[in-house]
């Protein structure tokens, strides 16, 4: 691992964290991703691995304050699009597993296949919007 850190965001009174690990190569990132759940990601340049609906010791995830998962990146693909894409997977995992949404909300029924469609939209739209703003002379700030 080249680098590792945590990012956090507070929503509706709940602070949630995601671990971020950066690897030198795609191969190293893919090997690391496989250690979390045994699944290969042969076509991926980045990945998200959620820590599940329950945490060690049987504590419900809703009351757990630790990281909800890990985003695995490689040095050569740390673009806004890729990072936004993987953070979308993290957000969907938080929504689904931590019950941020209303318990009767059928949203989860529409996001199958690993949430790839919304992650691609968010990643692409975010990258293109930031590029357009930058080209027009706007300063894009963190907050």
Please name every model-derived segment:
Residues 131-143:
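Long, well-structured alpha-helical subdomains associated
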Residues 86:
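Walker B catalytic acidic pair
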Residues 76-81, 93-132:
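Post-HEXXH active-site segment of zinc metalloproteases
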């Amino acid at each position: 691992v080249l680098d590792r850190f945590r990012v956090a965001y507070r929503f509706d009174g709940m602070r949630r964290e995601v671990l971020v690990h950066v690897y030198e190569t795609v191969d190293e990132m893919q090997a690391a991703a496989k250690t979390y759940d045994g699944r290969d990601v042969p076509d991926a340049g980045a990945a998200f691995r959620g820590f599940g609906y329950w945490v060690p010791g049987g504590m419900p995830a809703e009351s757990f304050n630790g990281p909800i998962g890990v985003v695995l990146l490689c040095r050569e693909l740390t673009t806004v699009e890729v990072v936004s894409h993987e953070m979308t997977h993290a957000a969907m995992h938080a929504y689904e597993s931590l019950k941020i949404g209303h318990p009767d909300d059928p949203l989860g029924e529409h996001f199958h296949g690993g949430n790839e469609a919304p992650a691609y939209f968010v990643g692409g739209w975010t990258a293109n919007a930031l590029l357009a703003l930058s080209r027009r002379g706007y300063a894009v700030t963190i907050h």
